[in-house]
Amino acid sequence: MVQSLRLGAANEAEDQNGMRRLNRLPIIVAIVIVALFVGFVVIGLAWRGLPFNRNNDIHSASNTPATNFGDQLKRGVTDGIIGEPVKREAFQPTPTMKQKVDKEPTVVDRPTEPEERRPRLETEEEWKARLMREQDEQIIREAQRQRMARLQARATALDSPLKVDISEGEKAPKNSTDTGQNPTATENNASDLYPAAMKSGIMGENLDPNAQASKEDFFNQDIKDDGYLPNRVVPQMSVYELKRGSVIPATLITGLNSDLPGRITAQVSQNVYDSATGYRLLIPQGAKLFGRYDSKVSFGQERVLVVWTDLIFPNGSTLQIGGMAGTDAEGYGGFKDRVDRHLWRTWSSAALIALIGTGIDMSMPESSTLATQDTASDAVRRNFAESFGRVAEQTISKNLNVQPTIRIRPGYKFNVLVDQDIIFPSAYRDN
């Protein structure tokens, strides 16, 4: 019973034996720190109130009498009596003396622009004098011009040769008599020198832009003189003769491209006989033609000019035919087959430039300022528009200046037009 009643007391005793008491060392350390802090604060406040400048007599003399302090303040200053303040007189301006001044007439400035804008009308005498002066000046200038022209003509005449070479004139009648021509043809050519000189003199004035006068001269150059013809009938010189106006049918062997100049060859496609009888074979089928073409093609041109210079026979002999023109199968001058005008490149470049310029113009922000102000965006937009406009114009102009390309394919049938009489030694024989 007794043991059961002490069960709780035993537990408490065990708890008291297992409890750890608080150590007093931290409390002492905290008290020391607080004391040190308070001591430092007190010492600092005390030092702030102490004087540091011991040499200053005024501040250090706390026990000195007030009389000595006053003497120290007025040290070096002599004794004096302070009198009454001096009265200052108020500033009064000196009166100005009135002088009699003569009144000058007032000049009113009036605008002179209307007077300058309105020209002063000339009198009749001044007008006549001015006209006479201008007339005299023109007369003097014209006289000076005529005088200088006479001096220049005289100098040219003095520098000209004194001999005239008439050897060419003597050779011309001999050649005309040898070929059966009349010497009057030379006289007609000499009579045309003056009109030719007049035309060459006024050529720079561009009085005939369509060249109508040259067309009339071309049409009437052989019928200027009425009556008999100056030339006589020339008899046939050989039975193996091919007259002018005849044609030589041929077929093109090599192709033709007008981008670059070059040489071409062809082959005679039919036998060619003499012009008088038509029975003597002069040029056999299979003979070769050698020629050249003109690569200078202008804008809008569809035909290319071809000339033939050599005729090579199957037996190996060669005949130089000078430069006879080639015509197509229908008789038109030049060759025509395929023409490339490069329109796709021209219009595609123009469309591309337009699209680029439109895109850049649309990408720029619109200006919200007044019309009189110029912002950076407006300047950029304007510069881009001008730059692309110039680029587009130059690109299109360059593409327009590109000449069209004319292509003549191999196998093209044409004719060689004989423009001079050809005399063969004999009928063709294959040796």
From Swiss-Prot:
TM region positions: 27-47
Family that this chain belongs to: Belongs to the TrbI/VirB10 family.
The organism of origin for this protein: Sinorhizobium fredii (strain NBRC 101917 / NGR234)
Gene3D superfamilies in UniProt: Type IV secretion system, VirB10/TraB/TrbI
GO cellular component terms, A-Z: membrane
Protein name per UniProt: Probable conjugal transfer protein TrbI
Gene name linked to the record: trbI
Compositional bias per record (Polar residues), positions renumbered to this chain: 174-189
Stretches for region Disordered: 95-122, 161-189
CDD domains: VirB10 (cd16429)
Pfam families for this protein: TrbI
